[in-house]
């Protein structure tokens, strides 16, 4: 039997195994090092090993070091209640420590000698300032640092003798200043799309206790004294009742507000908003990057909703729809289902240029009825309207503007998405009310949005119109003044029309005038359902920024919702106005977004065509690199 063939194995020397192993490890480590260095280059940027890299602008190398003035001389004005003066300063200390920014509390004498390495000076109610202290503040600003002040700062000398408003107006860039002590609580309305807007809703109406307020006459204030409908108090211009401003003074940044920064203990939600305003002011004054998400798509600065209430007079409404269609604008028509069922073709025409929504079954208020009774009527109206034209009926306008706390619950039970709410205005943008959809899935929420009517409707304006019998430009101006106010806030303007009032043919020229002006502005004109779709998707997006080197800022955008968000913009407040900007993604599959440097406040607008659901985006912003 033949022996099986065999092969001889070659034995490599042990040194060869060691050589190949070492070479393989060296190659692997080299590749990992190259990848790591590429990642560093794509995030931190080029760096020097033996020397520190110099920034193009010193603001990029500064940290946050806060000095708070505890002014005993100013406290003497509160001799009967010294604690009232100390409370705002103590709140500043608590807020800063909670943020991880331990402040340095200084005396009047220390302020007069200089501020050392501080980058932000806080002056809570420092009315009494001596000559040396004023000089220190002016030098501090000339060095490009930041000051945050409140109340009648600098209106008295070191002996607390009255000196006038010159120091305050010079500090803030205001034309004039005054004091005002209301007898009751008053409302303060905050502008939107500003550096503090991440947690303060646009047009937020904040009630503050009766106190001595300091008012400025200043252009483009961040907050102003208002009434319940977010209108400037006493019919004055917004600029004449300014309660908060931010301003560039020389090379420095100034934030000022004229109200107390503490609220009663039971107002914890509103207090957290004020605390956020304080912290955001510190970051902005210290020239740290801040990112906020824009309110509206396609670079628009506000939104407008054309709402037509159709009751009985469908002929006027049909003519009105033809006018709006000729203007190329969408509108939302609110109909009660009883009348709409008899005018099916008209309702289809309304739907073709926008959206049909509900006024209930009969056009009578639901206020005061039990939630179940309200829900049954709302559900029936929804079914009847959807039989006329296929499509979802998602919106409801309370007849005569009357609703109660049960209405929003009934709307959710009946499958609606929004209410055009007139009562209890809280802000200039939609307020989302969520409901647990299932006890087994507590994190799944149904949402109903309140769209507040923060402007007068045609009934109010026509009732107060005293112009010529033939409508003139003055009548259109009554609507447009409200539109400009809401646009300034960055909110939603509701152009609310009754078919039997402004829908009459003799007012068509006025309507066309108003619509032409709205269309010419950077305002997103849309329907109620589209507005709510956008706002609920936007509400799930978070943005954040941080400085990672003397030339680079990291921008993080996360869409945590289940719907894509299209044509959104992020406004990035930069430490300074760079000459050259580049934006790159740290993930190679992401495209770099388009961007534009705005001509105020060192703001970089970054535009995103789509933010996909459940997706995080990280970009590096390179400044003068």
Please give the residue ranges for each predicted region:
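N-terminal pre-catalytic segment of deacetylase/amide-hydrolase enzymes
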Residues: 100, 214-305
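Metal-dependent polysaccharide deacetylase catalytic core of the NodB/CE4 family, i.e.
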Residues: 155-156, 161-163, 301-304, 321, ...
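Surface-exposed beta-strand/loop patches in extracellular or lumenal glycoproteins
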Residues: 206-213, 558-579
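A glycine-rich, often tryptophan-bearing local segment used as a flexible ligand/cofactor-contacting loop or short
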Residues: 127-197
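Catalytic grooves of carbohydrate-active enzymes
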Residues: 301-312, 414, 451-530
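C-terminal beta-strand-rich structural cap/linker in extracellular carbohydrate-active enzymes
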Residues: 598-625
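Aromatic-Pro/Gly-enriched surface loop or interdomain linker
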Residues: 16-117, 263-265, 280, 284-287, ...
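Catalytic beta-strand/loop cores that center a nucleophilic Ser/Cys/Thr
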Residues: 181-250, 443, 451, 474-475
């Amino acid at each position: 039997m033949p022996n099986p063939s065999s092969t001889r194995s070659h034995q490599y020397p042990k040194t060869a195994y060691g050589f190949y192993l070492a070479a393989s490890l060296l190659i692997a480590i080299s590749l990992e090092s190259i990848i790591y260095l590429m990642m560093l280059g794509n995030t931190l940027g080029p760096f020097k090993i033996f020397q520190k890299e110099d920034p193009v602008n010193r603001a990029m190398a500064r940290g946050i070091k806060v000095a708070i003035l505890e002014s005993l001389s100013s406290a003497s004005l509160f001799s009967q209640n010294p604690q009232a003066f100390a409370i705002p300063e103590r709140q500043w200390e608590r807020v800063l420590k909670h943020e991880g920014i331990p402040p340095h509390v200084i005396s009047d004498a220390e302020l007069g000698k200089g501020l050392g390495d501080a980058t932000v000076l806080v002056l809570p109610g420092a009315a009494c300032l001596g000559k040396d202290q004023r000089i220190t503040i002016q030098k501090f600003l000339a060095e490009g640092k930041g000051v945050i002040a409140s109340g009648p700062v600098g209106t008295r000398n070191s002996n607390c003798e009255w000196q006038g408003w010159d120091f305050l107006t010079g500090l803030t860039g205001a034309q004039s200043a005054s004091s005002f002590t209301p007898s009751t609580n008053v409302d303060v309305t905050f502008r939107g799309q500003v550096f503090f807007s991440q947690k303060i809703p646009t047009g937020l109406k904040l009630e503050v206790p009766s106190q001595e307020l300091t008012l400025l006459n200043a252009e483009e204030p961040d907050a102003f004294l208002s009434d319940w409908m977010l209108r400037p108090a006493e019919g004055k211009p917004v600029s004449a009742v300014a309660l908060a401003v931010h301003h560039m003074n020389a090379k420095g940044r100034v934030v000022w507000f004229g109200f107390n920064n503490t609220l009663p203990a039971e107002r914890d939600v509103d207090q957290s908003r004020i605390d956020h305003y304080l912290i955001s002011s510190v970051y902005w004054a210290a020239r740290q990057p801040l990112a906020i998400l824009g309110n509206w798509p396609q670079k628009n600065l506000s939104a407008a909703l054309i709402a037509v209430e159709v009751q009985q007079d469908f002929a006027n409404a049909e003519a009105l729809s033809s006018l709006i269609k000729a203007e190329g604008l969408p509108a939302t028509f609110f109909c009660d289902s009883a009348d709409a069922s008899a005018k099916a073709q008209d309702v289809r025409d309304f739907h073709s240029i926008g959206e049909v929504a509900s006024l209930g079954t009969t056009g009578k208020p639901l206020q005061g009825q039990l939630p179940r009774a309200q829900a049954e009527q709302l559900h029936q109206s929804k079914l009847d309207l959807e039989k006329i034209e296929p499509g979802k009926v998602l919106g409801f306008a309370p007849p005569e503007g009357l609703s109660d706390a049960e209405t929003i619950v009934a709307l959710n039970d009946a499958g609606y998405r929004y209410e055009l709410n007139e009562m209890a205005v809280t802000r200039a943008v939609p307020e989302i009310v969520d409901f647990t959809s299932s006890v087994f899935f507590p994190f799944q929420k149904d949402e109903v949005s309140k769209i507040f009517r923060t402007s007068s409707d045609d009934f109010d304006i026509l009732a107060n119109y005293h112009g010529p019998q033939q409508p003139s430009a003055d009548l259109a101006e009554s609507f447009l003044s409200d539109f400009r106010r809401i646009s300034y806030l960055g909110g939603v303007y509701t152009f609310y029309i009754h078919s039997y009032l402004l829908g009459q043919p003799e007012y068509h020229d006025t309507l066309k005038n108003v619509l032409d002006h709205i269309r010419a502005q950077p305002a997103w004109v849309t329907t109620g359902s589209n507005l709510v779709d956008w706002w609920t998707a936007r509400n799930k997006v978070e943005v954040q920024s941080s400085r990672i080197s003397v030339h680079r800022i990291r921008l993080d955008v996360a869409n945590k919702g289940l719907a894509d968000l299209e044509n959104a913009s992020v406004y990035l407040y930069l430490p300074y106005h760079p000459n050259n900007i580049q934006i790159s993604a740290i993930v190679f599959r992401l495209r770099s977004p388009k961007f534009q440097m705005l001509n105020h406040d060192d703001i970089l607008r970054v535009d995103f065509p789509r933010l996909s659901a459940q997706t995080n985006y990280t970009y590096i912003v390179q400044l003068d690199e």
